[in-house]
A protein has these predicted regions:
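Structured loop/turn residues at beta-strand edges in well-structured enzyme cores
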Residues: 31, 102, 126, 134-137
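Short N-terminal segments immediately surrounding and downstream of signal-peptide cleavage
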Residues: 31-43, 287-291, 298-299
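Short aromatic-centered micro-motifs
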Residues: 109
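Surface-exposed beta-strand-turn/loop segments characteristic
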Residues: 73, 77-79, 85, 93-94, ...
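Short, polar/charged loop or turn motifs at beta-strand boundaries
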Residues: 51-70, 97-102, 128-129, 176-180, ...
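N-terminal periplasmic "start-of-domain" segments of outer-membrane beta-barrel proteins
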Residues: 35-66, 119, 170
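Cleavable N-terminal targeting peptides that direct proteins into the secretory/outer-membrane pathway or into
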Residues: 1-32
Length: 531
């Protein structure tokens, strides 16, 4: 049995010297002192009492009484960690601790005092959701900077998860939860089995966990339904405070149905008055006066058009009410749906009173699904004079200008979903050697592998632009121009041109996913919803 005043694991191939406080009481040679793990301190005391750095500790009893399914939610209740990334506000369902709000990469997360492989692409932050809750004995949070001890990634502090190494028996925990408002059901199954061997000199423990988070959509909560989440924006009232709480926030420069404006250079002119109120349509709204990035008219579900209505404009992008595009939609993901499986196997063995070996292995697989009702953002699409879908009300405008500009934040062109699969593998093996009562040396090898795969739906731009470029064939039926003339260039929007989709003009003759003229292109009617 290894006996010492303090043990602080966490450095591979490094010797850790423990200094005994001068104020400590004298200890007789016959007394055996209990082993104590203290994170971020070289003084062997209760981490909640006295330490050379600020430390907060969460005990096994605290974890059990918290009633939380995810260990990250328990730790995030500490005031210094309230800025942490949890599954509720993560698009991938991952969890990252964030001390003092300075970022997860500046908070060092350890398991048994040893480093853990990152759980995010391009970041050093650890996915805390991969730590087996059933084995957590305590959590120690060093809220002071610990760069001198642990390096630059511990600028804001250290969070150390200490796992049980003496588990014996079988423990099965099944937890389920369902919010009172419905949706978001959660089920977690934890199975832990452990045994001592070799007369108590060794211990082996295996844990298997399965977690199913049902997820919540915006439309499944009254406070978020129908674009109901209020936000703070610039106050349009010059006599009020600079910021105001605004309900029903919208992007007034665009719409879901499709905003229509005269071609470039034609904005603000008096073309038609389709609602017959004596005011030219393009003068009835700020969107009409702006023109090409907004519009004078909007399409109706049946393909007809109406005059654009502004609502209350807040700034150059946001407003409330009117015909602008919603900020949020009922089918958008509010809380992601996540399935997670964790398998953890640890072994420790005391070769002698001064030498102990350990092995920690873990495999985690998590799958997260999110959904957004937005299909894409398409601005300044060109509608040509020979487009057979052109509404009759706008034919006079087309005759004067020569083409129309179409902008749409589409909801009806395809379903936009994303699936994230994350796999984490971690293996740590090492030896702890205690040559004397106040010295400890640890030799360890730590290997971790993190892989993330993401799949999402998107629109194939060459097919989309070709489908938008619709003309009538000899029989008057709508067809793609590329089927009649495979050499024809199709119009693209301004932003595709600016991003190098083509060069020199707002047209492209590049086809990446189909051969023009092969009959694959299906004409798209931009006027009307689900047309």
């Amino acid at each position: 049995m290894i006996k010492s005043l303090s043990r602080k694991p966490g450095f591979a191939l490094a010797a850790l010297a423990v200094a005994v406080a001068t104020a400590a009481p004298t200890v007789s040679a016959q007394e055996e002192l209990e082993e104590v793990i203290v994170t971020g301190s070289r003084i062997p005391v209760d981490s909640n009492a006295v330490s050379s750095v600020p430390i907060q500790a969460i005990s096994e009893e605290d974890i059990r009484n918290a009633g939380e399914i995810n260990i990250a939610d328990i730790v995030a209740d500490i005031p210094a960690l309230v800025s942490s990334l949890t599954a509720e506000n993560s698009s991938t369902g991952a969890n990252a601790l964030n001390l003092r709000g300075l970022g997860g990469s500046r908070t060092l997360t350890l398991v048994n005092g040893r480093r853990h492989v990152a759980g995010f692409r391009g970041s050093q932050a650890v996915d805390v959701g991969s730590i087996p809750r059933a084995l957590v004995k305590s959590v120690e949070v060093t809220t002071g900077g610990a760069s001198a001890v642990y390096g630059a990634d511990a600028v804001t502090g250290v969070v150390n998860f200490i796992l049980r190494d003496d588990f014996e028996g079988l423990q099965v925990d099944l937890s389920t939860g369902r919010p009172e408002r419905g949706a978001g059901e959660t089920t977690v199954l934890d199975i832990a089995w452990g045994t001592n061997f070799a007369g108590g000199r060794g211990n082996a423990v295996l844990t298997v966990s399965a977690e199913d988070d049902g997820g919540i959509l915006y439309g499944e909560r009254s406070w978020s339904r129908n674009n109901g989440i209020a936000t703070t924006l610039n106050n349009p009232d010059p006599n009020g405070p600079p910021r105001a709480v605004v309900n029903d926030p919208r992007y007034w420069l665009t719409s879901h149905e499709g905003s229509i404006a005269p071609g470039f250079g034609g904005r603000g002119n008096t073309y038609v008055d389709i609602n017959g109120n004596g005011i030219a349509d393009c003068q009835e709204s700020e969107g009409g006066r702006v023109g090409y990035l907004a519009g004078c008219w909007l399409t109706n579900p049946d393909g007809s058009v109406r005059v654009n209505q502004d609502g209350v404009l807040i700034d150059g992008l946001f407003g409330t009410g009117g015909d602008g595009a919603y900020a949020d939609h009922n089918s958008d993901t509010l809380y992601p749906e996540t399935d997670r499986q964790v398998v953890n196997f640890n072994v420790s063995y005391e070769f002698s009173d001064t030498l102990r070996g350990f092995l920690e292995t873990k495999y985690v697989k998590a799958e997260t699904n999110t959904f957004s009702e937005y299909d894409g953002f398409f601005d300044t699409l060109e509608i040509t004079p020979d487009n057979p879908y052109l509404p009759a009300e706008l034919q006079p405008v087309m005759d004067q200008v020569g083409y129309l500009i179409f902008t749409k934040d589409a909801l009806d062109w395809h379903e936009d979903g994303s699936e994230y699969t994350r796999e984490t593998t971690r293996v740590v093996a090492g030896l702890e050697w205690q040559p004397s009562e106040d010295h400890m040396v640890e030799f360890s090898v730590n290997q971790g592998i993190f892989e993330q795969k993401s799949e999402s739906t998107s629109i194939l731009l060459d097919r989309f632009y070709a489908a938008m470029d619709t003309v009538a064939d000899a029989n008057g039926n709508p067809v793609c121009r590329s089927d009649l003339d495979p050499t024809a260039a199709y119009p693209i929007d301004y932003f595709a041109w600016a991003n190098g989709y083509t060069e020199g003009s707002f047209y492209s003759d590049r086809y990446y996913t189909f051969t023009p003229g092969d009959g694959q292109c299906q004409p798209l009617n931009p006027f009307g919803t689900y047309a």
